[in-house]
């Protein structure tokens, strides 16, 4: 696609008064500095923006409003910003329907008519009559209260659902009579990082922490998770503590009742990797039996059959395996393979009385169906090369559902018959997008240490490799999370306007199992950044794009990725989008759930060596005066209680204070929003319109054609 070019220097000069020190630098809102230092192993580290950690303080609120105005004033000058927003609204406006699930005498599914702030949960009876069951759009005036989870009892007569207000991780649990939809008068408050698991009709298990003191709810550290049982008809203050707290201090604890209602399973962990597993036989009223203790591996109960327990684990199997044991002696030495480890990472789902094994080869899914003895029933033929998710359901169900997607295929839901192996389209979205006009190719490139890395590159057919294609390079690189092909209407608009969307599967993720993850953690974390840098260099060397047309993008741990990359290699790209990022690596573990991320990062208190390593790449601590950084939009939310906004506030302030060239440094702060989940459609569209228009504008593009 052709673009008209614009001198961004002229636009930037016209936009704001210039600094007396450097006529190329924008005049940013004033951010005060304080005299504060911390000492680590004898080394003093200055923290001049420490005051921004108090996100409820009046001076912080005033600073936020100044930055919001500055950012919006800058974005308002982009001539095609509204045009891109209209394009996004237009393509977003299609009916989205989830896979159905059965509970009691009803079939439930969620649907969004197109531009609704939140999807609505519907149900259909045996006669085919459909009605609204839960409409989150009525939870709040602005559509920013979302449905976080829904859990029915076994008979489908009772339901407990949790809601998140403003994207917060602190939820409420509301209980309904599913038949009448009448709300029970016993709402549970201050619930965090919790499932909801029913025990018959008596009540349910849930998890939470002691809530931080008033004024630090969004930033205070949460520790010592607790599992409670709420008995219907009683007050929350009467809920029974099952496990956790001072007598069993663990950072994360989850409890659930198995499908046969016989066992209570408890998973406990101190970090995001590695867990202990305990099980209680409710039928025989045993105490908790330890299946595995310590945090050296991951294990969970995949299914049960009488006394037999099926466990899914990476113990002695970095790519994971399915094993079986018995309740009488579930220790690891008794485990027997049902589905053995292979060279590809494995995930397991159960439904229809079968196991469905999803193998990931170079970030692409392959699915196989096995019986309970581990005998292969069939390899399932998928509609193409991409990501298949689903295949879960009750043991008695013969029809299961799965969703298939890739970067140029909108997610389509298929109904799968476990007996015949036939798949048929259940729901295909009517998106204004023709996959036939686009290409999604996988390439492999070499990182700085010789490691081979896969990357998916998607774009519109007819693209010329002349180095002038606007390109978003996006990745994550952490916490064993795999980036698999998935369609996005935002990326569709980007590609429709001539852009390239590239996703490298860098180390730190789970694309090649535990070893791949571990190769991007702690003292090897820089492998992640080097992999990302090498991806950008590959795209530039092979003519897909050039520095002047490349944008770096990532969120959360991916925000760290972008922040570290742009401070290590400020010359790599024209634009950078560190979104809701972990950016102060010396203090991340002091806030909310941050201490649980230490498996990936290590902490500044671990050792002198670990402190020095973290400091050497921590984005907040590596912004250097006199350096020209990319045009940057630091993205955060003022109510983010997962990765607190202080990370972004500090990093953005450092960049604004030390930027040495005309490239703008914006801090886009979403007000009354959290880490990302549960935002309204309007909020998501607005952010992405800002992101895409800023990228193109900073690449020197004047208008779209």
From Swiss-Prot:
Its EC number is 3.4.21.26. GO terms for molecular function: oligopeptidase activity; serine-type endopeptidase activity. It is found in: Periplasm. PROSITE patterns: PRO_ENDOPEP_SER. Residues 1-20 form the signal peptide. InterPro entries: AB_hydrolase_fold (IPR029058), Pept_S9_AS (IPR002471), Pept_S9A_N (IPR023302), Peptidase_S9_cat (IPR001375), Peptidase_S9A (IPR002470), Prolyl_oligopep/macrocyclase (IPR051167). SUPFAM superfamilies: alpha/beta-Hydrolases, Peptidase/esterase 'gauge' domain. It catalyses: Hydrolysis of Pro-|-Xaa >> Ala-|-Xaa in oligopeptides. The active site is at residues 556, 675. Keywords: Hydrolase, Periplasm, Protease, Serine protease, Signal. Pfam families: Peptidase_S9, Peptidase_S9_N. One of its GO terms (biological process) is proteolysis. GO terms for cellular component: cytosol; periplasmic space. Cleaves peptide bonds on the C-terminal side of prolyl residues within peptides that are up to approximately 30 amino acids long. Has an absolute requirement for an X-Pro bond in the trans configuration immediately preceding the Pro-Y scissible bond. Belongs to the peptidase S9A family. Monomer. PANTHER family: PROLYL ENDOPEPTIDASE. This is Prolyl endopeptidase. The gene is f1pep1.
């Amino acid at each position: 696609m052709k673009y008209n070019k614009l001198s961004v220097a002229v636009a930037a000069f016209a936009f704001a008064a210039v600094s007396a020190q450097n006529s190329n630098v924008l005049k940013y809102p004033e951010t005060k500095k304080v005299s504060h230092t911390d000492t680590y192993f004898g080394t003093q580290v200055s923290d001049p923006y420490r005051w921004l950690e108090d996100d409820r303080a009046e001076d912080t609120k005033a600073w936020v409003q100044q930055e919001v105005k500055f950012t919006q004033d800058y974005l308002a000058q982009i001539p095609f910003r509204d045009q891109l927003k209209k394009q996004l609204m237009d393509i977003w406006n299609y009916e989205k329907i989830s896979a159905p699930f059965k509970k009691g005498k009803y079939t439930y599914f969620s649907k969004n008519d197109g531009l609704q702030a939140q999807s609505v949960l519907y149900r259909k009876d045996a006669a085919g009559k459909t009605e609204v069951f839960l409409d989150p759009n009525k939870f709040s005036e602005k559509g920013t209260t979302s449905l976080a989870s829904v859990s029915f009892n076994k008979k489908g007569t009772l339901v407990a659902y949790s809601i998140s207000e403003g994207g917060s991780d602190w939820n409420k649990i509301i209980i309904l009579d599913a038949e009448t939809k009448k709300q029970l008068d016993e709402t549970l408050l201050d619930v965090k990082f919790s499932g909801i698991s029913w025990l018959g009709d008596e009540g349910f298990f849930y998890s939470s922490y002691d809530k931080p003191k008033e004024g630090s709810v969004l930033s205070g550290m949460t520790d010592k998770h607790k599992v409670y049982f709420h008995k219907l008809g009683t007050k929350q203050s009467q809920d029974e503590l099952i496990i956790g707290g001072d007598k069993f201090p663990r950072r994360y604890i989850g409890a659930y009742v198995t499908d046969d209602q016989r066992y209570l399973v408890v998973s406990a962990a101190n970090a995001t990797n590695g867990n202990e597993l305990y099980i209680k036989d409710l039928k025989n009223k045993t105490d908790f039996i330890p299946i595995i203790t310590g945090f050296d591996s991951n294990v969970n109960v995949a299914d049960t059959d009488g006394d037999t327990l099926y466990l899914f684990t990476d113990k002695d199997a970095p790519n994971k395996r399915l094993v079986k044991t018995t309740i009488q002696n579930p220790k690891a030495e008794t485990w027997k393979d049902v589905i053995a480890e292979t060279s590809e990472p494995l995930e397991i789902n159960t439904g229809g009385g079968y196991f469905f094994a999803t193998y990931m080869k170079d970030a692409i899914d392959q699915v196989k169906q096995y019986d309970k003895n581990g005998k292969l029933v069939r390899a399932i033929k998928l509609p193409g090369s991409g990501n298949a998710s689903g295949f879960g359901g009750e043991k008695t169900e013969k029809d299961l559902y799965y969703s298939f997607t890739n970067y140029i295929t909108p997610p389509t839901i298929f109904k799968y018959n476990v007996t015949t192996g036939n798949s048929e389209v259940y729901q295909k979205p009517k998106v204004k997008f023709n996959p036939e006009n686009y290409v999604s190719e996988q390439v492999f490139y070499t990182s700085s240490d010789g490691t081979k890395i896969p990357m998916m590159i998607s774009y519109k057919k007819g693209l010329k490799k002349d180095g002038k294609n606007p390109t978003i390079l996006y990745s994550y690189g952490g916490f064993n999370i795999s980036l698999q092909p998935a369609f996005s209407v935002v990326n569709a608009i980007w590609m429709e306007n001539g852009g390239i969307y590239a996703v490298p599967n860098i180390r730190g993720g789970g694309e090649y199992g535990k070893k791949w993850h571990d190769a991007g953690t702690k003292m090897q974390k820089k492998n992640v950044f080097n992999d990302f840098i090498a991806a950008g260099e590959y795209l530039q060397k092979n003519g897909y794009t050039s520095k002047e047309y490349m944008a770096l993008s990532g969120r959360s741990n991916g925000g760290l990725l972008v922040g570290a990359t742009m401070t290590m290699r400020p010359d790599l790209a024209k634009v950078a989008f560190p979104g809701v990022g972990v950016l102060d690596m010396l203090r991340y573990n002091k806030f909310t759930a941050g201490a649980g991320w230490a498996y990936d990062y290590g902490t500044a208190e671990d050792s002198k060596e670990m402190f020095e390593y973290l400091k050497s790449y921590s984005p907040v601590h590596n912004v250097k005066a006199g350096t020209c950084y990319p045009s940057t939009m630091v993205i955060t939310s003022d109510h983010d209680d997962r990765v607190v906004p202080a990370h972004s506030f500090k990093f953005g302030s450092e960049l604004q204070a030390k930027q040495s060239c005309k490239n703008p440094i914006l801090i886009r702060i979403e007000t009354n929003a959290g880490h990302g989940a549960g935002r309204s459609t309007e909020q998501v569209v607005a952010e992405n319109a800002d992101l895409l228009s800023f990228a193109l504008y900073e690449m020197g593009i004047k208008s779209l054609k």
